[in-house]
Curated annotation (Swiss-Prot):
Residues 252-268, 278-296 have a biased composition (Polar residues). It is a peptidoglycan-anchor. Residues 1-46 form the signal peptide. The modification Pentaglycyl murein peptidoglycan amidated threonine is found at residue 316. GO terms for molecular function: metal ion binding. The keyword Ribosomal protein does not apply. It comes from Staphylococcus aureus (strain COL). GO terms for cellular component: extracellular region. The keyword Heme applies. Gene3D superfamilies: 2.60.40.1850. The gene is isdA. The NEAT domain is responsible for binding Fe(3+) and Fe(2+) heme and fibrinogen. The NEAT domain is an inhibitor of apolactoferrin activity, while the C-domain confers resistance to bovine lactoferricin. This is Iron-regulated surface determinant protein A. Belongs to the IsdA family. Residues 317-350 form a propeptide.
């Protein structure tokens, strides 16, 4: 008996079910992507409409200028206030748009106003347009075409109030507080083109950059003078920063001060006779011999110090040689270790 997973019928069923699953998964993915794309496009359209709406509104407002104006509705043939005045919002507004003038007013209880007509002084009917009809607030905004200089308008209305069974037609006249003024033209919006940023151009090097040279500070030796009298025969002793050379300078300083003292004695004592001159020359010779002996002693003392300095120098050459030998030895050991591992693996494989 063959197992069920070796049966050809079972295998074909498994293939068909797998194909169905793949097809359903692909279809669901495509459908989901289409839904997502559609929702995204709707959001983009809504965003563009939202951005265009204020732009259009601002364009319309910018093309029109307005000014408030007060008025009163009076009964026909008298200056008595009419009840119609209570059903209109005050003040009104004079609007100039596209070089045309309009008187704009808002009617309260708009559902009561079944008919309204406006006439000028020559009994010519004026065009009336509805700007906004708010059913919820029961108000209606209308524009009546007028001309600058109009002082009053004649109105004929038909009012119906079902609650009190009121249905009446009557004529009134609308008196402006002042004549319709002449308004200035609206400032046209400047179409400012967006400034496109220019690509930054690389600056051409005008001057070659010079390498920065390290500054070398010159050490100025300090000069110590023996006395003020030594104008012609001044002795200068250079003092260094190291403490080991101070002994050398001190010995040289003592020797030279002795010589300068003797020379001063020579200058101060006048030459009276040959005997005194000879005695002075003998004294000078003796002092010179002493100074030479002291110089030899100081040089002899300096030689062990110089030798000690030579001993203190670092062995840079030896350390570099030692490092090279150690690296070569380490590399050789590593190579031998790798070769031994390779031979060991070959033996194991055999």
């Amino acid at each position: 008996m063959t197992k069920h997973y070796l049966n050809s019928k079972y295998q074909s069923e498994q293939r068909s079910s797998a194909m169905k699953k793949i097809t359903m998964g692909t279809a669901s993915i495509i459908l989901g992507s289409l839904v997502y794309i559609g929702a995204d496009s709707q959001q983009v359209n809504a965003a563009t409409e939202a951005t265009n709406a204020p732009n259009n509104q601002s364009t319309q407002v910018s093309q029109a200028t307005s000014q408030p104006i007060n008025f009163q509705v009076q009964k026909d043939g008298s200056s008595e206030k009419s009840h119609m005045d209570d059903y209109m919002q005050h003040p009104g507004k004079v609007i100039k748009q596209n070089n045309k003038y309009y008187f704009q007013t808002v009617l309260n209880n708009a559902s009561f106003w079944k008919e309204y007509k406006f006439y000028n002084a020559n009994n010519q009917e004026l065009a009336t347009t509805v700007v906004n009809d708010n059913k919820k607030a029961d108000t209606r905004t209308i524009n009546v075409a007028v001309e600058p200089g109009y002082k009053s308008l004649t109105t004929k209305v038909h009012i119906v109030v079902p609650q009190i069974n009121y249905n009446h037609r009557y004529t009134t006249h609308l008196e402006f507080e002042k004549a319709i003024p002449t308004l200035a033209d609206a400032a046209k919006p400047n179409n400012v083109k967006p400034v496109q940023p220019k690509p930054a151009q690389p600056k051409t090097p005008t001057e070659q950059t010079k390498p920065v040279q390290p500054k070398v500070e010159k050490v100025k030796p300090t000069v110590t003078t023996t006395s003020k009298v030594e104008d012609n025969h001044s002795t200068k002793v250079v003092s260094t920063d190291t403490t080991k050379d101070q002994t050398k300078t001190q010995t040289a300083h003592t020797v030279k001060t002795a010589q300068t003292a003797q020379e001063q004695n020579k200058v101060q004592t006048p030459v009276k006779d040959v005997a005194t001159a000879k005695s002075e020359s003998n004294n000078q010779a003796v002092s010179d011999n002493k100074s030479q002996q002291t110089n030899k002693v100081t040089k002899h003392n300096e030689t062990p110090k110089q030798a000690s300095k030579a001993k203190e120098l670092p062995k840079t050459g030896l350390t570099s040689v030692d490092n090279f030998i150690s690296t070569v030895a380490f590399a050789t050991l590593a190579l031998l270790g790798s070769l031994s591992l390779l031979l060991f693996k070959r033996k194991e494989s055999k």
